[in-house]
């Protein structure tokens, strides 16, 4: 019995059949159009939203939710929510196993992610994270007071901050 959640050997790119690549294109291209089209709409709305509302985002949060729900639908992934999402400001803690977690969590709640500062510079993902209001932190003790102030400011603005637990993206037994 394996200590990992994986039941068999992972396929390599060479083992993927032509039909798999066709599915990647048939699902991936529409998702890319939705995500980057949503980013354009999000940016245009934010241009008008920011001067009047500052860090509050009553319009662009809905764009993020619709983009994530639509993307999951296009990928053939359904979402099931148990319980009731927190309605007020506060902190949410979740495990993180893949990039799909971000879509699923954004699709079901109006949240802002807290991420390590390096994410802001990642190609593509950094752009999306910055646009959607991710809070970037430096994991250094010297920055703790500054980061506490940022968290306080965002919570007072009514934000719900989402923290991923550290190192949960690693598989067991690796």
List each language-model region with its residue ranges.
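A transmembrane-helix-recognition feature enriched in membrane-embedded lipid enzymes
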Residues: 8-80, 127-131
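Soluble catalytic domains of membrane acyltransferases
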Residues: 73-174
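Short, charged cytosolic
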Residues: 1-8
């Amino acid at each position: 019995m394996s200590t990992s959640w994986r039941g068999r050997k992972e396929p390599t790119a060479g083992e993927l059949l032509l039909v798999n690549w066709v599915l990647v294109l048939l699902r991936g291209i529409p998702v890319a159009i939705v995500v980057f089209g949503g980013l354009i709409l999000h940016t245009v709305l934010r241009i008008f939203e920011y001067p009047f509302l500052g860090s509050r985002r009553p319009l662009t949060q809905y764009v993020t939710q619709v983009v994530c729900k639509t993307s999951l639908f296009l990928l053939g992934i359904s979402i099931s929510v148990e319980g009731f999402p927190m309605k007020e400001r506060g902190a949410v803690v979740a495990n993180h196993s893949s990039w799909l977690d971000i879509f699923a969590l954004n699709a079901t709640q109006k949240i802002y992610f807290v991420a390590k500062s390096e994410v802001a510079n990642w190609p593509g993902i950094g752009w999306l994270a910055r646009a959607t209001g991710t809070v970037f932190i430096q994991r250094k003790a010297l920055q703790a007071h500054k980061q506490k102030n940022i968290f306080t400011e965002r919570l007072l603005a009514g934000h719900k901050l989402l923290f991923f637990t550290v190192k949960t993206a690693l598989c067991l037994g690796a």
